[in-house]
Amino acid sequence: MKPGPNWNYEKGVREQADWDNHARFVDDLFDRGLIMLAGPFVPEGAGALVILNVETAEEARALYANDPWAHRDILLLAEAKEWTIFLDAHGRLMK
């Protein structure tokens, strides 16, 4: 994720315009089991990383096209890549 042209660098993440709607959107994805990890980079305003539990990069793009912040050009999907996990937190090989 990368800041869009309407990101306000004078404000923190939770102070950006339409934060409540963006937070509800992200919470819904999390509640549906679609977000595995997510959070902003440091320093604030440097973008964010989101790891989704989806099958394709296209599915990730389609999901984030509905983000209220994407509609307002506040935070945009910079790149979507498909990723194969070989090791989990316990060091086991994933298949």
Q: Would you name each region that the model predicts?
A:
Residues 1-95:
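Conserved, structured core segments of small domains
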